[in-house]
C-alpha cells in the first residue's frame, strides 16, 4: 500500500509545494510444490518521504527547487533468491534529495510543441563509514566475521556492510521541443 499527500500551495504569495508519502510492500517467495506463496520467506520495504518545492524567480520564473528527506527500511526473512547478497537481515536507507528544474514547455504539458525542460538532481546519503570510522576494506579478516576455521562468513559481512546504505546519485535530464 501507499499513501501520498501533496499540497500544491502551502500559503503565502509564492507557491510552496509540500508533499508526504508513506508506503509498505511485502513480497513472498513462491513454493512450486504447493503452488502457493510461502509466507515464511519474504522481502519487505517500508518507506517515508517528506518534501518541499518552490518556484524560483532567479534567473527566471521557470526554475523550481525541490528538496526531500527519504527513509526506507528493507527486511529480508529467509529470502535467498540470489537477488541480494544476504537473505536474512535488514538494511536502512536515509537520503536527502535535491533537484533544480527549469521547465518552460508550452501548449500542452503531455505532448509539448515547444520549449524545453532541464533537470539536475542529486540523491545523497550520510557518510556513515566516515562518521563511525568503520573501514570495510579489511572486514573479511576481522574475527567477529569469521567462523572457527578462520573463513569469512559472507552473510554477516554483507549485513554489516549494508546495514546503513551509503551512496550518492547524480542525474541530469534535458528535453528540447521545437
Model-inferred region functions:
Residues 95-178:
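Extended beta-strand-rich architecture
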